[in-house]
Amino acid sequence: MTQGILADKKGLVVGLSNDRSIAWGIAQAAHAAGAQLVCTYVGEAMGKRAAPLAASIGAVALDCNVADDAAIHHTLVAIQAQLGQLDFI
């Protein structure tokens, strides 16, 4: 990872789905700028595509349905346990 504008920053990228998604482009750019990332996806099927992408840039991948308050809470708890406080979403 190069040291860029996001060096030592921790971020969340929501909605990673595949290598053509906007979220993937954002994750790649943030990683290239030095960020540590958590990427979310929705559902097991999407996770089969999203998790390897996230892993390829050293990011954590978590399943999170943003329409479910309990899922959001669970995801935030997991993020805090892994990265601590987020600097950007």
Where are these regions (language model features)?
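Short-chain dehydrogenase/reductase
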Residues: 1-88
